[in-house]
Amino acid sequence: TLRRALALRHMELPVGDFIRDALASEVPFLAREILESNVQDEIKHDRALGYVADAWGVDPKAEREALALRDAWTEHPDHTILKAMVAERAIFFVLLPFMRFAGDAGMRTVSADISRDEQVHVATNSLVCRELGLEASPSLDKLRKATIAWVMQPLGKSSDKYLDKKFWLDSSDRLMYEGKAPQLSDTQRARMPAFFEHANQNLPQYA
């Protein structure tokens, strides 16, 4: 499962491209500078996750399937800034805590660093989507569900909720529909301060 999560690092640069494409359209002027900074963050995230993948090794089948998912996100017709927001809020905000629970020290450190950036990204993208009146289509939501289900597919039912597939799928659903996932509040007891301990009314809430 961790190697599937790592394989989705291939989504980092496309998310940056989604934001870059949006900058060429109707994005509000005041949001442009921070969105341009977010694009640079995605490049750094791709590099950092690449180092982790090198250390862990990759699953060739998972890599191929992740690239197919990346292409599906790229080709989806919804607005690019909306795709970026959904991917970061309801996919990455699930995978990063999963890496913190299931990964080694290096993976936990990288996920914490990325998380601090992602809180800004989601806040910015959410505000831009609201300003433009954008809402995810049913087909984009279906793609979101398929993506997180693919990552967590190797997990089954477990008495340890952090190894239970339904726990993570439900977390993605709640982040998508409610903007919060209270079931992830235990991450506040992880070794390092988690990104979702920072108060921001525009962010998904975990507690």
Predicted regions and their residues:
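Non-heme di-metal
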Residues: 1-207
